[in-house]
Design a protein with these regions (language model features):
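Secreted/extracellular ectodomain signature
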Residues: 4, 8-130
Length: 130
C-alpha cells in the first residue's frame, strides 16, 4: 500500500493550488525591471506555468519600460508570450502625457496602478515589490 502523511498531502495540495502573484514596479531602473521579469520566469518554473497567474503592474517612473522604445522591449514581449500580464497605470500615463500608441503592443492597462495592486491583494494575490 501507499502511506501518505498529512504533511505530504498539505504540500501536494498547496503545490497544486493555483498561485496568484502581483508584482509592483515603480522605478525606471533597468536592473529592477530585469529582476521583476526574472521573478516571472522563476515563479513559472517553480509552480509550473499553468499553476501560477502573474501580473506586473507598472506605475510612476516604472512605466517607461513599457514604452515602445524600451531597452527591455524583447524581454517584455517574451514575458507576455509566457502568459504573464503586464499592466500600465493610466493615471501615470496621463500625468506623463503618454498615449497607448506610445506603449508596447499587447500590454494591459489599469485605471490606477495602486488601485489594481490593492484589488489583487484583497482578492488573495501575493504581493512582490520589484
Amino acid at each position: 500500500g501507499c502511506l501518505v502523511t498529512g504533511q505530504a498531502l498539505a504540500q501536494a495540495s498547496s503545490t497544486a493550488a493555483k498561485q496568484h502573484i502581483v508584482i509592483q514596479v515603480s522605478t525606471p531602473e533597468t536592473r529592477i525591471w530585469s529582476q521583476a521579469l526574472n521573478y516571472v520566469e522563476n515563479l513559472q518554473s517553480l509552480y509550473g506555468k499553468d499553476n501560477v497567474e502573474i501580473e506586473i503592474v507598472a506605475l510612476g517612473w516604472g512605466i517607461g519600460m513599457l514604452k515602445f522604445d524600451s531597452p527591455l522591449a524583447t524581454r517584455v514581449a517574451d514575458t507576455l508570450k509566457r502568459g504573464a500580464g503586464l499592466s500600465a497605470c493610466e493615471v501615470t500615463m496621463s500625468r506623463q502625457k503618454l498615449q497607448k500608441q506610445d506603449m508596447l503592443p499587447d500590454i494591459g492597462y489599469v485605471p490606477a496602478g495602486l488601485g489594481q495592486i490593492i484589488k489583487r491583494q484583497r482578492d488573495g494575490w501575493s504581493y512582490i515589490s520589484g
